[in-house]
A protein has these predicted regions:
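Unchanged
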Residues: 1-267, 354-355, 390-403, 407-409, ...
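Left-handed beta-helix
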Residues: 185-196, 210-418
Length: 418
């Protein structure tokens, strides 16, 4: 699923959809579900898209090529007007409903439905194997989470066989949440211990038997979590697949910021360095990163960057990034650039007083996200410290969820202090 407008990730989604947002220096969010599919032996993939999709389409088309003699594909299914439908997708279920006609042209018994804005590594073969073994009509991947965090997720109660007996989307009532808490017997079966009550949270990952999906969508329901799943409860066999590995829903600026910075830890919970289950992305053929006279502590730096005489502490730096002399970056996610500036362009921009792409000399930047192609002049100071958690500032700078964000292509003049 390509996702909706991504308003909670704004301004990162101002010019792109959520799955196209850069991740971990060189990837995009959409690479995660596609790579999980490919590593699980699933290579017939439909990507349903709608808002700000140009960069997503370009990335997928440039990245996922299959040989002419195989049956694998990643097909982009953009929202379209037809004789039957004249408007946009109205939700996750509606998006799938409108594309079922395309699924039918490929032989299949099961349909796996995924979100495009999550970070995790999962072997979907295990989910499908459990789905078959239990005789399930629908299997929902679920993760144990503290009851204090369940209000923003779908919650389910299961019996000893993991059959779902109760489901609530984003429950608020304390009594309802308490009724959804995992039983001591189920807690004892898990490998991850807990000091408090937990609920099983829906990960937004579904396996449907083919006929059941068609029946479930033979109506006007728009959303899987809010409508379709509750409507099937008691009528079909719904089971949970419990996943105890690392999983994060990157739905907000804060979640995106923290998920990226977590990758800079010495031993991150999500490991991009697993050769057996790699995360695939576009091969850009960039040169190695050049680092000159720098102090670097816990950082991830993308290909083709030039980092000179500066300090990086707990940072994720993207491709083609330029960080210049005397600058200090701490707790910063910098997405890099789509291009290099030529010598002629650098001279022309300097004559016009336009800062070069990247971070200038003598800057001090903390707690920030710097989107692609931003131009930050010399002596700029940026930090969300001491400011409200949400606010608007000069040069299109925003603070969202306590994180300062420099939007894509923004120009921050020399000496600016925010």
């Amino acid at each position: 699923m390509g996702g909706g407008r991504g308003t909670r990730l704004y301004p990162l989604t101002k010019e792109r959809c959520k799955p196209a947002v850069p991740l971990a220096g060189k990837y995009r969010l959409v690479d995660i579900p596609i790579s999980n599919c490919l590593n699980s032996g699933i290579n017939r993939i439909f990507l349903l898209t709608q808002f700000n999709t140009a960069s997503l389409h370009r990335h997928v088309q440039n990245t996922y090529h299959f040989d002419s003699f195989g049956q694998g594909f990643v097909d982009i299914m953009a929202a379209e007007q037809t004789e039957k439908y004249a408007d946009w997708y109205q939700g996750t279920a509606d998006a799938v409903r409108r594309n079922v006609v395309h699924f039918r042209t490929h032989p299949h018994d099961y349909v796996l439905i995924l979100s495009g804005d999550q970070l995790y590594r999962m072997d979907f073969r295990k989910v499908i194997a459990q789905h078959i073994a239990t005789g399930a009509d629908v299997t929902i991947a679920a993760q144990p989470v503290p009851v204090s965090k369940i209000e923003d997720l779908g919650a389910m109660r299961v019996d000893d066989n993991l059959e779902i007996k109760q489901f609530a989307e984003k429950p608020k009532d304390a009594a309802l949440i308490d009724s959804l808490a995992m039983s001591p017997a189920l807690e004892a079966r898990l490998t991850t211990g807990s000091t408090g009550k937990r609920c099983l949270a829906s990960m937004g990952i579904y396996v449907f038997s083919r006929g059941v999906l068609q029946q479930a969508l033979d109506n006007s329901m728009r959303d899987f979590g809010k409508e379709v799943i509750p409507s099937l409860l008691g009528r079909k066999r719904l089971f949970a697949y419990i996943f105890e590995g690392y999983w994060v829903d990157i739905g907000t600026v804060r979640a995106f910021f923290e998920a990226n910075l977590a990758l800079a830890e010495p031993v991150p919970r999500f490991n991009f360095y697993m050769h057996t289950t790699p995360i695939y992305t576009h091969a850009r053929f960039l040169p190695a990163t050049k680092i000159n006279r720098c102090t670097i502590d816990n950082a991830v730096i993308g290909d083709g960057s030039i980092i000179t005489d500066c300090t990086l502490k707990h940072c994720v730096i993207g491709i083609r990034a330029m960080v210049r002399d005397g600058s200090h970056l701490e707790d910063v996610v910098m997405m890099g650039a789509d291009f290099y500036e030529s010598e002629e362009e650098l001279k022309e921009h300097a004559a016009r007083g336009l800062p070069s792409v990247g971070v200038g000399r003598g800057c001090n930047i903390r707690g920030s996200i710097i989107d692609k192609n931003a131009r930050i002049g010399d002596g700029v100071v940026l930090s969300p410290e001491g400011k409200p958690p949400n606010g608007e500032y000069p040069y299109d700078v925003l603070i969202r969820d306590g994180v300062l964000v420099v939007p894509k292509g923004a120009v921050i003049p020399p000496g600016t202090k925010i």
